[in-house]
Amino acid sequence: MFKKYDKKKLRKKRHLRVRKKIFGTSEVPRLSVYRSEKNIYAQIIDDIKGTTLVSASSVDKDFKGNGSNKEAAKVVGKMIADKAIEKGIKEVVFDRGGYIYHGRVQNLAEGAREGGLQF
């Protein structure tokens, strides 16, 4: 009999493994990514204070278009980079959220780099 693996459970397990090693401070906060079927979300977090400093997603009012493709992820990456630079954040630690660094997650990271963030 074949075992059917729960993808969400495996992703959360990978995310916990990655989060043990990644930690965001106020000087170098963490850029966290979450992707759903229809949208993509990114937020910059200070783990010491436990606060979200900046957030952007394909659900925001300034975003136009389909939120579930690679182009949308790149736009969200540029949006979060612009908001972060306005707040004086130039360097972040990238947290891929247990997802493979490919497709929408990779495009969001590239968009953030193009926007001026360093990680």
Swiss-Prot record:
HAMAP family: Ribosomal_uL18_B
Pfam families documented for this protein: Ribosomal_L18p
Assembly, per entry: Part of the 50S ribosomal subunit; part of the 5S rRNA/L5/L18/L25 subcomplex. Contacts the 5S and 23S rRNAs.
InterPro entries, sorted: Ribosomal_uL18_bac-type (IPR004389), Ribosomal_uL18_bac/euk (IPR005484)
Protein purpose: This is one of the proteins that bind and probably mediate the attachment of the 5S RNA into the large ribosomal subunit, where it forms part of the central protuberance.
Organism field: Clostridium kluyveri (strain ATCC 8527 / DSM 555 / NBRC 12016 / NCIMB 10680 / K1)
Lineage, highest ranks first: Bacteria, Bacillati, Bacillota, Clostridia, Eubacteriales
Organism superkingdom: Bacteria
GO molecular function: 5S rRNA binding; structural constituent of ribosome
Annotated S-S bridges: none
Swiss-Prot/TrEMBL GO biological process terms: translation
Annotated CDD domains: Ribosomal_L18_L5e
Entry protein name: Large ribosomal subunit protein uL18
Entry keywords, A to Z: Ribonucleoprotein, Ribosomal protein, RNA-binding, rRNA-binding
UniProt xrefs under SUPFAM superfamilies: Translational machinery components
Family to which the UniProt record says this protein belongs: Belongs to the universal ribosomal protein uL18 family.
Keyword Zinc-finger recorded: no
